């Protein structure tokens, strides 16, 4: 899992590339929390356009990010979600809790 971060006007964007599975989830959570704690954004955008596969570990990542952003009074948006991860989010109900673009 490759992760790149950019921040602009209290919006943090994390661009994800590769497989979001149990191998990459821990590193992604650590990086996301580090970036959130550094930039203190009001919005976190997870750009998933580069995600080629996602299992239930991706749900844990999104929920952890959502929890941290709620502590800061902010929100999470999932952007450019490919078909396979979207099916996982829809089946889990995450799509009802987190905005998807």
Give the positions of each predicted feature.
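Short hydrophobic/aromatic patches at helix-to-coil boundaries
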Residues: 2-4, 97-101
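Amphipathic alpha-helical interaction surfaces in cytosolic regulatory modules
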Residues: 19-98
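Short beta-strand/loop segment at the start of cytosolic alpha/beta domains
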Residues: 1-15
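Conserved catalytic submotifs in the C-terminal HATPase_c
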Residues: 8-9, 49, 101
């Amino acid at each position: 899992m490759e992760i790149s971060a950019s921040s602009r006007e209290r919006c943090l964007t994390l661009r994800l590339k590769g497989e979001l599975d149990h191998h990459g989830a821990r590193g992604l959570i650590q990086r996301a929390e580090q970036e959130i704690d550094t930039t203190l954004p009001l919005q976190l955008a997870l750009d998933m356009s580069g995600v080629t596969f996602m299992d239930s570990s991706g749900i844990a990542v999104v929920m952890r990010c959502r929890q941290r952003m709620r502590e800061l009074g902010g929100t999470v948006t999932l952007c450019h979600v490919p078909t396979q991860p979207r099916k996982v989010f829809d089946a889990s109900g995450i799509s009802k809790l987190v905005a998807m673009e």
